[in-house]
Amino acid sequence: MTSRGRARASDRRARGAVVASGKIDFTDAGCFELPYAPVAEALLPEGPWKVVEGGVCAAKGFKVAGYKAGLRAKGTRADCALIVADEDATCAGIFTTNIMCAAPVTYCKKQLAGKPTARALLINAAQANAATGDQGAADAQATAEELSKSLGVAEEDILLMSTGVIGKRIKLDKLMPAIPILSANVESSTAAANAAATAICTTDLVRKTVAIEVQIGGKTVCMGGMAKGSGMIHPNMATMLGVVTCDADVTPEVWRNITSRAGAASFNQISVDGDTSTNDSLVCFASGKAGNAKITSVDSAEGKLLEQALTAVCRGLAKAIAWDGEGATCLIECNVSGAADDEDARVIARSVVCSSLAKAAIFGHDPNWGRLACAAGYAAPVKNRFDQNDLKLSLGPHQLMDKGQPLDFDAVAASRYLKEVTGVHGTCVVDISVGNGSGRGQAWGCDLSYDYVKINAEYTT
């Protein structure tokens, strides 16, 4: 290739893999190079669904695109994504509980409070647009207005997400010219879905996508999701963005209810480092294109099955985020049983996966039952405190405690279990029973390694 040819190739990469025809090449390795591991698929709970291809394009009625606008300080990876519904889609969202919420979070909450449908979601990486004051809000408004013009849809049908460095405003000089290109290139393909899932990532090591189909009311309903997140992950929404598309026909009230419950049982049950971010958002769309009879009750058989499917997708994505925790060598799954109710069980499970001492012990292959029991004991807020004499605790196949006291277990074998799990980036299972109640709960986290400190000492958030 001549020097001029190399320059032209380089220029194409710099412009986000747009070829001469104006089409984005979603297979361009320079922009969409983030590797994929089928973690979310592998971590899906069992159920009456099957995994399919397509990511957020698996559901009927949606088109997507990813693009490199030049928002990142370095590197060639794409940095913005667009999801567009063919028609008004029922929409629900849950957002960060951090008081310092970002401008796009405030914008989305206002939009969804005004109407239960949306047409498009624009996501940018690199700049979080958090702690940016009135100008940050104006920037969000400006991007929504530009997207509204490009797509020919009402501004109130636009939603926004941002992720990246807190305190940094969006580079409008880069993003605004990219919006018409994104709008012109949305398509319903696996390649486009993968490109979008890659574009939204920051410190993630893998892109996170999953899609399933399930029979509801005699019709095939498809549901796909993508998420990003690796650090600043903590219950009640963390530095994670999640998007789910679904083609079920469902009322806004039912969709809001099951989105809230699915989020509570998934994304709000993960922790990497105990930091709750400014930007966390989960937005779920339902196009109604599956042809099923409209689901009008959460208590109907169809409503329950739809909730199970949405929870499964959200759990697969949430667990993939914890698996990909910064510096992590394993996923930690804590299962709690015997609590007074499910919420108490969830609180206890969250407490265990949030414990820095427990996480460090697992990284060091130390079957330290004391740290695990301690974390269960200080869990708060719980409505009903358990009796310490009822505590049973197991690490994988090794029971470490019974009736609140340590057992004479094989410490070498238990340590070997941890070494084997971390050696293959597998799942370390912690089972805890706190009594005879009916409450059950799960939470997911990851171990705490030297690399976590290194990554966050070198990366500005």
Swiss-Prot record:
> Which GO molecular-function terms appear in the entry?
glutamate N-acetyltransferase activity; L-glutamate N-acetyltransferase activity
- Return the annotated site residues (Cleavage): 238-239
Q: What is its main location?
A: plastid
Q: What class of enzyme is it?
A: transferase
Enzyme Commission number(s) of this protein: 2.3.1.35, 2.3.1.1
Residues of the active site = 239
NCBIfam families linked: ArgJ, PRK05388.1
* Known partners and oligomeric status: Heterodimer of an alpha and a beta chain.
Functional summary from the UniProt entry: Catalyzes two activities which are involved in the cyclic version of arginine biosynthesis: the synthesis of acetylglutamate from glutamate and acetyl-CoA, and of ornithine by transacetylation between acetylornithine and glutamate.
Protein name (database record)? Arginine biosynthesis bifunctional protein ArgJ, chloroplastic
- Species of origin reads Ostreococcus lucimarinus (strain CCE9901)
